[in-house]
Amino acid sequence: MTILSAERAPSRRILAVVTVGRYTCAAPILEICRILHARGHTIEFACLDGHQGLATPHAFVSKIHVVGRNMTVEEDKALYRLFDESDASNAEGRKGTFRALMKFHSWWPETYRNLKALVSDPAYRPDFILADLLADACIDIMNEFEIPLAVHYPQMPIQMAPQKYIPGMPGAQLKHLSSEHASLWDRLQEEYHVLQLIFAMKDYILFQRKMRREMGLGPRPPPRKPDYLVLVNSFFGLEVPKDLPPLMIPIGPVLADTFTPLDTTPELLNFLQVHRKVIYVAFGSHVELPAWRVRRLIKGLVQALESGDIDGVIWAWKDRASVMKDLESDPSSIDDAKVEYSAILDNRNEGFKIVGWVPQRAILDHSSVCLYLSHCGASSTMEAVYHGVPVVAMPVYGDQLANGKRLEAAGVGINMNRKNFTAEELSANIKTLVRDEQGSFARNVLRLQRIATANSRRKYVAADRIEEVMYDAELLSSDEAVVSRPMHLQTPDSRMSWFKANNLDLYLVYIALFAVPVGAVRWISNNWL
């Protein structure tokens, strides 16, 4: 090959990997893959058995590889029950979070083995891997096979690119996202919370080390700076601004250019044409709602309807049959007998429309929707800010908790605690957001919507950066040349000792240069003068 005959942007095989993650994890990755395919690259998809449907709607995916078994219904329910029971305010609740993560990561050995077998075959070896955060076996594949990698994160990685003005554990703070308005006591509490989390994750760390040891691999310490491309599906304005290394870029919100229109669901379209102040309620496909929480939610929504702050409720809720039985047997429901729960859940109340599935983006984009009561999952958060809908946040676990705080800090929502909220609190928050007496919520919603719209084009930057890293990696060395150059986007301090990268050796020389003459003068003055 000569420089003159080489292509500037040759087509390559790119493997997208999503394992225990679901639609929220796969959708932004596949949207970036769509852009890469339009540039001539071949796209293949690796997933767990049963998740092939994530990729089948996308004609650009040329092949689907199964790299692990599916999660059973029982395992799925047990996992998300653990997440729902997790609570950062007590030791057992914190341990519950890491027990749930252990279940997620128990798929690592199987996916690692199968991915290793896949990339070992020259017929399927990819030129680049684009992986979901939860498919962390891809990092080991990168290290072992020297295949360049990009990892998609729904928020800024917790341990990468730390900043002194961001207290505690980023993404897992108790109260403050930055130190700007935090008191000294607040910051001390955040640091103490980090110690609590470290103690709670002890079994999780030992579990990971045991798995890796059984596979013949050593521990993999998290880097302060990545040695792979990190694509963060978020943006500054929602995230706290901070300096980032070249291999970390915010690319969110990554959303498809089109979405399913409302005319595919005539009953919802008719409802929105009749009602003009509708709150949309959705808690995702994995959040289980206990009867007491449903009762408070419905009671709060009924109060908001009675006060006139809203005139309709659209609730996306697939599995509500079991909750209906629990509500009927719940003794606390006697206190609010005037609320006809069965009529509401059976869609016999004109103010409510409860359906198993909705075209969410079309709902949020409709002018009749004035509020979104959400669990603040990654997709839901991005769609809410992009379509300009204020949020009553009721996060449950993981990045949802941070997203709830971020929406409130950005002035586009109010955050509630799922463990102890009341119906009166919910109706009061709806009133505050809808009436918006100072106009601050409307102003901030529009502000953040415009920022999100501008940043939504950064998915093309993600594709650019993938090509950049991929082309750089394949020409860093050759069979003829032993010398290999480092990644062009990796800062040199990542390959240096902490001592040298911080110039401590240089400072020691300065101290010596100052101390020796001073010491000599003092010795001379004490002994000769």
UniProtKB/Swiss-Prot annotation:
Pathway stated in the Swiss-Prot or TrEMBL entry: Mycotoxin biosynthesis
Listed EC numbers: 2.4.1.-
A GO molecular function for this record?
Answer: UDP-glycosyltransferase activity
Provide the topology term for how it sits in the membrane.
Answer: Single-pass membrane protein
Quote the catalytic activity from the record.
stromemycin aglycone + UDP-alpha-D-glucose = stromemycin + UDP + H(+)
Where does it reside? Membrane
Q: What function is annotated for this protein?
A: UDP-glycosyltransferase; part of the gene cluster that mediates the biosynthesis of stromemycin, a depside C-glucoside with two unsaturated C9 side chains belonging to aromatic polyketide glycosides. Acts as the tailoring enzyme responsible for 3-C-glucosylation of bininalkenylresorcylic acid to yield stromemycin.
What family is reported?
Belongs to the glycosyltransferase 28 family.
The name under which this protein is listed is UDP-glycosyltransferase
Q: What is the lineage of its organism?
A: Eukaryota, Fungi, Dikarya, Ascomycota, Pezizomycotina
